Amino acid sequence: MASLGVQLVGYILGLLGLLGTSIAMLLPNWRTSSYVGASIVTAVGFSKGLWMECATHSTGITQCDIYSTLLGLPADIQAAQAMMVTSSAMSSLACIISVVGMRCTVFCQDSRAKDRVAVVGGVFFILGGILGFIPVAWNLHGILRDFYSPLVPDSMKFEIGEALYLGIISALFSLVAGVILCFSCSPQGNRTNYYDGYQAQPLATRSSPRSAQQPKAKSEFNSYSLTGYV
């Protein structure tokens, strides 16, 4: 039988992973302006996300513009959008499925069926974590490649934004949650314990009354025959 505490820990991590992935997907600071070289003194700082880009002035005013078209964006941005949306959908579905398979709920009272449902929820968490980790790692690689490339001008270089750190942590939470839910159930162990108890109980109840009744019957018969002839 799966441990209730382990399942709760896995489910909470999955919820945190879903929340972090959704926030990281919407944040506009996947890439932030790099203040190196000639661009160390500038009046405007830029940040780019999956859905919008923002400009922060030296006065503290920030202006954000949503991308006017999605089809005109670079291929890596489009792929990141699709994978992050799919990751959030997978994690949301995993949260719903895992609720049915957890021991603290009243759904699906059969313990074996609950274990199977919990494993399915864990698999969806793992898929959501993988889909959320790929675009984050992809953008992280592109930022580091352009930053250390001598062919890219200093004004075109960006640094790692806070959204990427949040995306990495959220993806790891989803992966760990899926692994916990998948390995917290052991159907084979439950099956062996169930059959062992079922076979041992009838043998104990049937053998003990017979052994106790046979000597008693012999003693009654012997006493009856002796008193009758005397």
Swiss-Prot record:
On this chain, the residues bearing Phosphoserine are 219, 223
Location in the cell:
Cell junction, Tight junction; Cell membrane
Q: Consequence of mutating residue 54 to A?
A: Disrupts trafficking to tight junction
The covalent link annotated as Glycyl lysine isopeptide (Lys-Gly) (interchain with G-Cter in SUMO) occurs at 218
Gene Ontology biological process terms, A to Z: calcium-independent cell-cell adhesion via plasma membrane cell-adhesion molecules; cell-cell adhesion; innate immune response in mucosa; paracellular transport; regulation of bile acid secretion; regulation of intestinal D-glucose absorption; regulation of intestinal lipid absorption
Q: What happens when the gene is disrupted?
A: Both female and male Cldn2-knockout mice are similarly hypercalciuric compared to wild-type littermates. Cldn2-null mice are hypercalciuric due to a primary defect in renal tubule calcium transport and develop papillary nephrocalcinosis. Cldn2-null mice are also found to have increased net intestinal calcium absorption, but reduced paracellular calcium permeability in the colon, suggesting reduced intestinal calcium secretion. Cldn2-knockout mice have decreased bile flow and show increased susceptibility to cholesterol gallstone formation.
What cystine linkages occur within this chain? 54-64
Q: Where is this site: Paracellular cation selectivity?
A: 65
Tissue and organ expression note = Expressed in the kidney, liver and intestine, with higher levels in the ileum than in the jejunum. Low levels in the brain. Expressed in colonic epithelium (at protein level). Expressed in the perivenous regions, bile ducts, and gallbladder epithelium (at protein level).
Cytoplasmic side, ranges: 1-7, 103-116, 184-230
Q: How does this protein lie in the membrane?
A: Multi-pass membrane protein
What result is annotated for mutating residue 54 to S? Does not affect trafficking to tight junction. Causes loss of pore formation. Impairs transepithelial conductance. Impairs sodium paracellular permeability
Outcome of swapping residue 53 to Q: Does not affect the channel activity
Summarize the record's induction comment: Induced by IL22 upon C.rodentium infection. By CDX1 and CDX2. Induction by CDX2, but not CDX1, is potentiated by TCF1.
User: How is it regulated at the activity level?
Assistant: The channel permeability is down-regulated at acidic pH.
Task: Relate the assembly described in the record.
Answer: Can form homo- and heteropolymers with other claudins to mediate paracellular barrier and channel functions of tight junctions in response to physiological stimuli. Homopolymers interact with CLDN3, but not CLDN1, homopolymers. Directly interacts with TJP1/ZO-1, TJP2/ZO-2 and TJP3/ZO-3.
The task this protein performs is described as: Forms paracellular channels: polymerizes in tight junction strands with cation- and water-selective channels through the strands, conveying epithelial permeability in a process known as paracellular tight junction permeability. In intestinal epithelium, allows for sodium and water fluxes from the peritoneal side to the lumen of the intestine to regulate nutrient absorption and clear enteric pathogens as part of mucosal immune response. In kidney, allows passive sodium and calcium reabsorption across proximal tubules from the lumen back to the bloodstream.
- What's the protein here called? Claudin-2
The organism named in the record is Mus musculus
